[in-house]
């Protein structure tokens, strides 16, 4: 018999621990293979035995997040973090937590856990790449450079790593190091570039030249080196336009104007429709101020490129002789009208904007003379498009009757062209007839139901006319409406900012209309007889709901815009690595520049300014708390203490009816799936107790961090800081406004008067801040304002404003009107002054001010 060799038995705890770790590693592999449910099953088995197994808690949170159970995922991750002392967990646990935080877009936390994974002994060098990506996302380029370098050291065989290191060095101002990095790889890859890699190689060569050019600045020797490098790489570069433009710029900096002009002529030959090249050619030839030489130049260029616009158009911008200019205008405009070019007016509109007094009467005479010689039957194409041109001409001059006359002539002749309906609607819009304008566009839309442009234009006009239901109906013809009654959800999904902002503004206007009607009904209720009071009470309840609904929906739609822009910002995350893999460093740097000004884009700023009206009003209403004001947020009218059972029963019945109505109406206004949105009407938004904090978080903070000083809206800054009690910042905004627009501006006067009155003893602002602002006003503007009259209640500030700043600055007057409760100005007199100053404005602007501002 053989004797069994005796072995020392392993402790049970160690066996269990090894089994647990094996199970965890298996669960981790399943997660990596996207088999989340199987991974969860293994993790549940581990946690059943040891509920404090931190690695399993973290991985389970990540698994749950991956299957969509985000609330449970957050709970497990929070539990795991609670059990960790500081960041002293296993490298795998820290890595898992880093991935989870990245998925939830908590980038700073993700960086913390990825760093912890490396500090705790992780050998996974891929973490450096993820770390660099996240650091780039939050703008921490200094640490991103460290991470890029570590990753590059670990994986030297990939060009993307060399490119990403060079980009990181460039962004951190280490330009020579970036050049050296790119040059080093070029030496290693010399003669080994395959056809599929040639584009990437071309981009990296041009990127290297970009860095050299930035580093050279105006140094002549360095610029010569940049030029030499450009000539050396020219055969390998695909972007010939970029290369030639750079070459011409360097020649200009070196003073080699003749060489620069040759390059610009080459660029014009390659793309004769680019206006920029012609203007730069003028500069390189040194003839910008010599109209005679410019005329000769463009005469020759027109012969070389007879079918191109710039040589024909540019002389129209500088010719001074009336007869010569008239001749050139005739040669430029009439052939287009003969061919029936719809964009003829658009082509010459820059001339109207820059040389209105000289060009406008000449073109009017030329085109009217041309029209008088046309036969509508024999020359139908020139006839209709000449009328179309003249209608646009008179619309630009704000001669609306004549504009209507000519577009009607075109429509009477050919009522089947959509462009004519669009122009007629524009004219009616300027006249303030929004309902009629929308109706005209609807007629035009019916002519071509497959045209998305006319569809969107019609939607926009219906929204401007406050006909939201019809606008949504028309917009929904081009949306996916699989799981909803209209296209609202799809328009949010595709981030159609133009529609959402227009709809928000329409809701805001409806809110103002209903609020005004509600105030009128409340006043009427006190005056009418008892037999009519019940009907009025019902009308009040109806309007209360509509006020609340429109206000909430307006704010809801405005708040959708920053969500889109946050998504745009988050979308950059993938490109921090994608652009390096694809070898497009120049495009990547353009994206970084775009991201730095993301929250200053026109649509975002427009939504922010409109939303500020609601947030500021909510803040002001909250502060007033007048006992005699009608509370628009309540669901029912106060019943003077009567609490009979019949009234309670009635109230209960009304509440049930309202809930049913909300359910019905929610289907047509819901912007998101029901499981993602529990506040369809935005009621929680308008019930906030912190409107200014909400405005700052949603809009203002991002805007304020990114906006350039020369683009900043100082009025918005002033109003925001005024409401949060930061008078010193209000003065700073006033001061900057004065430097940009002068101290004669009506808006400057209005802002200063409001700020002056904020320093009175009876205002709720900080006494120290009031003293600081008073001293600042005395120092800077003592000659502009009667500062000693600030405590004089009988002083006529409106008369002072009128004498000092005039009475025609409508924006300044409207600003004063908004703060009429804070400044002792007779609101009726101010209102009369505003109305009397409306005459220079277009009818639609007059209507808007009368209806929504006063």
Swiss-Prot record:
A Pfam family assignment: NatA_aux_su
Cellular compartments annotated: Cytoplasm
TPR repeat segments: 20-53, 54-87, 91-124, 126-162, 241-274, 384-417, 452-485, 728-761
PTM per Swiss-Prot/TrEMBL: The N-terminus is blocked.
Keyword Nucleotide-binding: no
Keywords, sorted A to Z: Acetylation, Coiled coil, Cytoplasm, Phosphoprotein, Repeat, TPR repeat
Gene3D superfamilies: 1.25.40.1010, 1.25.40.1040
Coiled coil: 623-667
Primary site of residence: cytoplasm
Spans annotated as Disordered: 626-668
GO CC annotation terms, alphabetical: cytoplasm; mitochondrion; NatA complex
Signal peptide positions (record): none
Record bears the keyword Cell inner membrane: no
Other information: Present with 7600 molecules/cell in log phase SD medium.
Assembly: Component of the N-terminal acetyltransferase A (NatA) complex, which is composed of ARD1, NAT1 and NAT5. Can self-associate. NAT1 associates with the nascent polypeptide chain and the ribosome.
Function as written in the Swiss-Prot or TrEMBL entry: Non-catalytic component of the NatA N-terminal acetyltransferase, which catalyzes acetylation of proteins beginning with Met-Ser, Met-Gly and Met-Ala. N-acetylation plays a role in normal eukaryotic translation and processing, protect against proteolytic degradation and protein turnover. NAT1 anchors ARD1 and NAT5 to the ribosome and may present the N termini of nascent polypeptides for acetylation.
Protein name from the UniProt record: N-terminal acetyltransferase A complex subunit NAT1
Native source organism of the sequence: Saccharomyces cerevisiae (strain ATCC 204508 / S288c) (Baker's yeast)
């Amino acid at each position: 018999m053989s004797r069994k060799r005796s072995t020392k038995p392993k402790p049970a705890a160690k066996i269990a621990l090894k089994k647990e770790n094996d199970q965890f590693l298996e669960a981790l592999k399943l997660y990596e293979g996207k088999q989340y449910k199987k991974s969860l099953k293994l993790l549940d088995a581990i946690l059943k035995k040891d509920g404090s197994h931190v690695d399993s808690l973290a991985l389970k949170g990540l698994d749950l997040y991956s299957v969509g159970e985000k609330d449970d995922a957050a709970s497990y991750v929070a539990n795991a973090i609670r059990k960790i002392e500081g960041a002293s967990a296993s490298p795998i646990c820290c890595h898992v937590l880093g991935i989870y935080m990245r998925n939830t877009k908590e980038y700073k936390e993700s960086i913390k856990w990825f760093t912890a994974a490396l500090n705790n002994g992780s050998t996974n060098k891929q973490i450096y790449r993820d770390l660099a990506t996240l650091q780039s996302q939050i703008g921490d380029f200094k640490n991103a450079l460290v991470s890029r370098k570590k990753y590059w050291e670990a994986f030297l065989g990939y060009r993307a790593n060399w490119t990403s290191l060079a980009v990181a060095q460039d962004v951190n101002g280490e330009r020579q190091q970036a050049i050296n990095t790119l040059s080093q790889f070029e030496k290693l890859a010399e003669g080994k570039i395959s056809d599929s890699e040639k584009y990437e190689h071309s981009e990296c060569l041009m990127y290297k030249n970009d860095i050299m050019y930035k580093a050279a600045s105006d140094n002549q020797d360095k610029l010569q080196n940049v030029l030499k490098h450009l000539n050396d790489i020219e055969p390998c570069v695909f972007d010939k336009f970029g290369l030639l433009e750079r070459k011409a710029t360097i020649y200009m900096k070196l003073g080699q104007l003749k060489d620069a002009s040759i390059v610009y002529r080459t660029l014009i030959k390659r793309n004769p429709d680019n206006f920029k090249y012609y203007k730069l050619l003028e500069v390189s030839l040194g003839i910008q101020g010599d109209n005679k030489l410019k005329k000769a130049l463009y005469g020759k260029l027109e012969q070389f490129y007879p079918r191109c616009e710039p040589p024909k158009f540019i002389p129209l911008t500088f010719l001074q002789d009336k007869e010569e200019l008239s001749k050139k205008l005739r040669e430029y405009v009439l052939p287009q009208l003969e061919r029936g070019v719809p964009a003829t007016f658009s082509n010459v509109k820059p001339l109207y904007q820059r040389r209105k007094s000289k060009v406008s009467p000449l073109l009017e005479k030329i085109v009217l003379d041309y029209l008088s010689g046309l036969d509508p039957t024999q020359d139908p194409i020139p006839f209709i498009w000449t009328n179309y041109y003249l209608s646009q001409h008179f619309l630009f001059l704000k001669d609306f009757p004549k504009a209507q006359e000519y577009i009607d002539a075109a429509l009477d002749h050919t009522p089947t062209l959509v462009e004519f309906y669009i122009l007629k609607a524009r004219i009616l819009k300027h006249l303030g007839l929004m309902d009629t304008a929308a109706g005209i566009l609807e007629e035009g839309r019916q002519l071509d139901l497959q045209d998305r442009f006319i569809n969107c234009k019609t939607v926009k006009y219906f929204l401007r006319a406050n006909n939201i239901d019809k606008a949504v109906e028309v917009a929904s013809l081009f949306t996916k409406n699989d799981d909803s009654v209209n296209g609202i959800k799809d328009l949010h999904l595709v981030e159609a900012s133009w529609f959402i902002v227009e709809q928000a503004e329409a809701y805001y206007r409806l809110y103002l209309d209903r609020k005004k009607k509600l105030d009128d009904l409340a006043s009427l209720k006190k005056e009418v007889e008892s037999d009519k009071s019940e009907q009025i009470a019902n009308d009040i309840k109806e309007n209360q709901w509509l006020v609340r609904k429109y206000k909430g929906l307006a704010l809801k739609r405005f708040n959708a815009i920053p969500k889109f822009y946050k998504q745009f910002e988050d979308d950059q995350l993938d490109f921090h690595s994608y652009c390096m893999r694809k070898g497009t460093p120049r495009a990547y740097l353009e994206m970084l520049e775009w991201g730095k000004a993301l929250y200053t884009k026109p649509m975002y700023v427009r939504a922010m300014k409109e939303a500020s009206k609601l947030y500021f009003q909510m803040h002001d209403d909250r502060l007033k708390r007048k006992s005699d004001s009608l509370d628009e947020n309540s669901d029912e009218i106060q019943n003077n203490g009567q609490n009979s059972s019949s009234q309670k029963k009635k109230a209960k019945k009304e509440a049930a009816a309202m809930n049913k109505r909300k359910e019905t109406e929610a289907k047509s206004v819901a912007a998101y799936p029901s499981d993602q949105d529990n506040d369809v009407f935005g009621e929680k938004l308008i019930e906030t107790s912190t409107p200014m904090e909400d405005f700052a978080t949603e809009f203002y903070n991002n805007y304020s961090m990114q906006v350039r000083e020369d683009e900043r809206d100082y009025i918005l800054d002033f109003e925001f800081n005024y409401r949060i009690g930061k008078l010193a910042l209000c003065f700073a905004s006033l001061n900057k406004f004065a430097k940009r627009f002068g101290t004669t501006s009506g808006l400057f006067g209005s802002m200063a008067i409001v700020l002056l009155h904020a320093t009175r003893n009876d205002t709720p602002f900080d006494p120290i801040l009031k003293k600081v602002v008073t001293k600042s006003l005395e120092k800077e503007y003592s000659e502009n304002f009667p500062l000693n009259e600030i405590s004089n209640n009988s002083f006529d500030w409106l008369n002072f404003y009128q004498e000092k700043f005039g009475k025609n600055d409508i924006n300044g007057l409207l600003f004063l009107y908004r703060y009429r409760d804070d400044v002792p100005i007779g609101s009726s007199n101010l209102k009369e002054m505003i109305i009397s100053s409306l005459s220079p404005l277009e009818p639609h602007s007059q209507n808007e001010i009368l209806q929504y501002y006063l």
